[in-house]
C-alpha cells in the first residue's frame, strides 16, 4: 500500500492517464513557404503560423498570416543581449530561460487552452534557434503536432526572394495605363469587385505612388513586408486567367517593386484609360479629400516639388490652396507637373503601350466603372 502523502511513481501516473504522443518535426524554409497556401485540413497544412520573435521584429515583416507569440519581447531581448555582452552566455541564458518560460506560459494560458489535438502550428523565430525551439518543444510536449521551421525568418526571406520570379513567370498580366487622375485605381477596384484577379500594388504599399501620394494616417510597410505581401498575392493567383495591375514606376512611395515583377509588367499587354481633364480634376478632388480639407498638409506635400517646379510656382499653388482654390491647383498640377512627358515615359517603359487597348472613360461613377470592368473581363467591347 502506498504511504499517505507519498508521491506516485512515473509508472503509476502513466497507467492512469492517456499517453501523450510527442510530435515535433523540422522543415526547410522553402518547403514551409510552399505549404503556407495549403488549407489546414490538408494532411501537411498548418492550422496556424506562430512567430516567436519580438513584436518589433514581427512588425517589420513576418510570414503571411503569422500570429505573434514573442518568447522575448522588445525590452527582454535587449536585456538578454546586454547580459550576453557584459556577463557571457551562461548568465544571459539563465535570465533568458526564465523570461521565455514565463512568456510561453502566458501564451498557453491566453491562446492554447481551448484548442483541440488537431491543431498543427508552424513555429519560427529569427534563425530557428532557442526562441522558437522552446515554444515548439512545450507545444509538442502537450501533444500538438508541431512543425519547426529551420533557419527561421532569415531562411524564409532567402527562399522568398529565390521563388518570387517563379511566381511571377506564369502569370498573364494586363497593365492598366493612363495619366494621373484618369481612373486607373478605380477601374482596378471595379475589376476586383466583379471577380477579376487584381494585384493592387498601391493598396499593398499604402501609397498612391505619385509625389503627393502619401496617405495621411497610414505608414508604409517595410520593403521586406511589401515583398512578402506581393509574394503571397502572387501565389494565390490562377495562372489560367489574366491578372490586372496598374502601371507603376519602380518605386511606390518609399518601397520598390521587385525586379522580376517590374520586368514582367513592362513587357505585358496594356490597357490605356483616357479621361477628360475636367473629369480627372473632379476624380482627384474626390479621391484626395484630405488635400482639400487640410490646406496646410497640402502645402507641406507640395514642398517636395520645389526642386522640380521652382519655389515661386509652388508658393503660388500654396497660396491658392489656402484661399480655397484647390481645384485650380489640381488642374495646374496635372497640366504643369504630371502630364508633360507622361505618354513618352510610359511608352519608353512599357514596350506594348503603343498597341494598348483604349478605354474612353466618360463617367467616374461606381456603376459606370462596374459596367466597364465587366465588359473588359468578359472580352466584350467595353464602354462607360
Per-segment meaning from a language model:
Residues 122, 144-158, 200-205:
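A short glycine-rich beta-strand->turn/loop micro-motif centered on a GG-aromatic cluster
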Residues 196-263:
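Conserved nucleotide-sensing/catalytic segment adjacent to the nucleotide-binding pocket
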Residues 41-116:
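Positively charged, proline/Ser/Thr-rich regional signature most characteristic
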Residues 3-5, 9-64, 92, 161-168, ...:
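Flexible, polar/low-complexity N-terminal or interdomain linker segments that lie immediately upstream
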Residues 136-138, 186-197:
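A conserved segment at the C-terminal end of the G1
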Residues 95-150:
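Catalytic cysteine-centered active loop of the rhodanese-like fold, especially the PTP/DSP P-loop
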Residues 131, 174-192:
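Glycine-rich phosphate-binding P-loop
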Residues 263-270, 274-384:
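Conserved NTP phosphate-binding and transfer environment spanning the P-loop NTPase/kinase superfamily
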Amino acid at each position: 500500500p502506498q504511504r499517505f502523502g507519498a508521491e506516485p511513481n512515473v509508472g503509476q501516473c502513466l497507467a492512469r492517464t492517456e499517453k501523450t504522443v510527442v510530435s515535433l518535426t523540422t522543415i526547410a524554409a522553402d518547403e514551409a513557404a510552399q505549404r503556407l497556401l495549403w488549407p489546414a485540413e490538408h494532411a501537411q497544412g498548418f492550422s496556424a503560423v506562430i512567430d516567436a520573435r519580438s513584436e518589433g521584429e514581427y512588425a517589420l515583416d513576418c510570414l503571411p498570416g503569422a500570429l505573434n507569440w514573442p518568447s522575448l519581447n522588445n525590452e527582454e531581448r535587449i536585456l538578454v543581449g546586454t547580459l550576453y555582452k557584459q556577463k557571457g552566455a551562461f548568465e544571459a541564458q539563465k535570465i533568458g530561460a526564465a523570461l521565455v518560460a514565463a512568456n510561453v506560459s502566458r501564451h498557453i494560458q491566453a491562446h492554447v487552452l481551448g484548442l483541440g489535438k488537431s491543431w498543427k502550428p508552424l513555429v519560427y523565430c529569427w534563425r530557428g534557434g532557442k526562441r522558437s525551439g522552446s515554444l515548439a518543444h512545450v507545444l509538442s510536449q502537450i501533444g500538438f503536432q508541431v512543425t519547426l521551421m529551420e533557419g527561421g525568418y532569415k531562411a524564409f526571406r532567402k527562399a522568398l526572394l529565390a521563388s518570387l520570379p517563379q511566381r511571377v513567370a506564369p502569370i498573364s498580366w494586363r497593365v492598366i495605363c493612363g495619366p494621373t487622375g484618369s481612373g486607373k485605381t478605380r477601374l482596378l477596384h471595379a475589376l476586383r469587385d466583379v471577380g477579376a484577379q487584381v494585384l493592387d500594388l498601391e493598396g499593398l504599399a499604402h501609397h498612391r505612388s505619385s509625389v503627393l501620394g502619401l496617405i495621411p494616417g497610414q505608414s508604409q510597410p517595410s520593403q521586406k513586408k511589401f515583398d512578402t505581401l506581393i509574394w503571397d498575392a502572387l501565389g494565390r493567383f490562377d495562372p489560367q486567367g489574366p491578372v490586372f495591375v496598374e502601371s507603376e514606376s519602380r518605386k511606390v512611395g518609399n518601397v520598390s517593386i521587385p525586379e522580376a515583377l517590374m520586368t514582367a509588367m513592362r513587357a505585358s499587354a496594356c490597357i490605356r484609360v483616357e479621361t477628360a481633364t475636367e473629369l480627372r480634376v473632379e476624380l482627384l478632388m474626390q479621391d484626395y479629400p484630405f488635400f482639400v480639407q487640410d490646406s496646410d498638409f497640402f502645402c507641406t506635400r507640395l514642398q517636395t516639388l520645389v526642386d522640380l517646379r521652382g519655389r515661386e510656382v509652388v508658393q503660388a499653388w500654396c497660396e491658392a490652396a489656402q484661399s480655397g482654390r484647390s481645384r485650380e491647383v489640381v488642374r495646374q498640377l496635372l497640366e504643369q507637373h504630371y502630364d508633360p512627358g507622361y505618354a513618352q515615359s510610359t511608352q519608353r517603359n512599357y514596350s506594348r503601350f503603343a498597341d494598348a487597348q483604349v478605354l474612353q472613360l466618360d463617367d467616374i461613377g461606381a456603376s459606370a466603372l462596374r459596367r466597364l470592368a465587366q465588359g473588359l473581363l468578359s472580352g466584350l467591347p467595353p464602354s462607360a
